[in-house]
């Protein structure tokens, strides 16, 4: 009798920088999976800061944050060190293959559109994100949109796909 596998081909395809399979990790503990844009983006930096602030609540609920990024592991390490979460699990995806997987299906938008988007300008200036988190040049794919997924038992339970780069996800509702 042949054994039936409940594993998806995606299971083996996504590994963290430490070599752990993402969906296997979500079978051990729930995962808050945060897809970042580029490290020069104010809102990317804000997402890292937001998750850092939520770290005690995530730990209380036994939820492990994992970040997916387009940058080099060295640049990522510097950012996560700066925000106080140097040992957080990370996935290096310079070609954005994981971002485009049907299970995540994150959009793309020309970076120039952000400059004429009132919600983005509101986030930068009125909310003060540009002053709090800074901004620098786009060093990876600036078209890539971010997103956040809550994984449990090898499945996506809830998701938040950004419509614009300044969208503010409700992390606590997402991990509900």
Q: What do the PLM-derived regions correspond to, one by one?
A:
Residues 47-100:
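Structural microenvironment flanking redox-active thiols in thiol-disulfide oxidoreductases
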Residues 17, 27-28, 60, 143:
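A generic fold-level signal
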Residues 89-166:
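Thiol/selenol-based redox catalytic cores and closely related redox-interacting motifs
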Residues 22-51, 64:
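Short active-site neighborhood of thiol/selenol oxidoreductases, capturing the structured segment around
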Residues 17-21, 51-54, 78, 135-136:
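A generic local structural motif
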Residues 1-24, 46:
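N-terminal "domain-start" segment that seeds a small globular fold
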Residues 166-176:
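A short, polar/charged loop-to-alpha-helix boundary motif
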Residues 36, 69, 152:
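Short beta-strand/turn micro-motifs composed of small residues
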